[in-house]
Design a protein with these regions (language model features):
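Basic/polar, cationic surfaces and motifs that engage anionic cell-wall
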Residues: 60, 75-146
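Active-site-adjacent loop/helix surface patches within enzyme catalytic domains
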Residues: 1-100
Length: 146
């Protein structure tokens, strides 16, 4: 189940695959479900384990300085309108609450760990997110390294 996957809560005896990954330290600050609902797992001021070995804009270990937002879905399946709406509201709130995020830099896991992570994938509409954010006064800056 998607909620448990991002909270390091998959029971190893529920599926043989879960047993093979039980040693991984995986978590996320939030998960935005297909219906747009948001579940927070880790407080924003604490470290979540979503990025793994990563590099972005001159810094290693993105878990140390980033917010991990997961979207339920696959790389190829278009995300739901409600997910984009929730994501834009969340980013705006984060930029207003945390001055270090107000510069507007936003990256996907595929940007910070290319070759190892693929999300949010080609189905994610970055232009739509930018429009939604700018329409509500949020900043949006993106640098694709791949």
């Amino acid at each position: 189940d998607a909620a448990n996957a991002y909270n390091a809560g998959l029971p190893p005896d529920a599926d043989p695959y879960f047993a093979t990954i039980q040693h991984l330290r995986v978590s996320s600050h939030v998960l935005i479900a297909r219906d747009g609902s948001l579940t927070q797992y880790v407080p924003f001021h604490e470290r979540a384990w979503h990025a793994g070995r990563s590099y972005w804009r001159g810094r290693d270990e993105c878990n140390d300085f980033s917010v991990g937002i997961e979207l339920e879905g696959t790389d190829e399946e278009p995300y739901d309108d409600r997910q984009y709406e929730t994501l834009a509201r969340l980013i705006l709130a984060l930029q207003q609450t945390y001055p270090m995020l107000a510069d507007g830099w936003i990256a996907g896991h595929s940007d910070i760990a290319p070759g190892r992570k693929t999300d949010p994938g080609p189905a994610f509409d970055w232009r739509r997110l930018e429009r939604d954010l700018r329409a509500n006064g949020a900043r949006f800056r993106r640098e694709v390294l791949a």
